[in-house]
Amino acid sequence: MTRWLLKTVAADGAAYGDFVWPLEVGAEVTAPDWSDAPKCGGGLHGLLDGRGDGALLDWSPDAVWLVAEVPADAHLVDLDGKVKVDWCVVAHVGDQVSATGFLADQGVVDGVVGAHVVAGHRGVATAGNHGTATAGNHGTATAGNHGTATAGNGGTATAGDYGTAT
């Protein structure tokens, strides 16, 4: 099963600690300071399969959203709300909608932070923090903190803190 790293960077690829991510699809990225210690630093950080702490992402309109493939032989360390890896391959460069859409196209659809999710009649839609979930009639829509959940007639909509449910 392919694993994915979702992260945001500045328009020039700059990230925390002055590390600059390549903005070319197919670029191999290696952590110059790799450490398998279970603490921040010493790796390439992001949200594994788009799930984790949405507060770690840059929500500004000019942020670049990256999705990187985590190869099977990459070292991965689980941190609280994020992970770090020793290397990965850039698979997508874009904005919030295109990056979360890329993950959805890869079959990663459950709880992706920032995702815009739509489900049809009697469908189920779930979005992570800052996400949007929409479901058709008799469907269920659930959104995380700061999210929006909308369901059609007879449906159920649930939103987290500061969210809106209709």
Task: Show which residues each predicted segment covers.
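Short, glycine-biased loop/turn motifs at secondary-structure junctions and
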Residues: 1-166
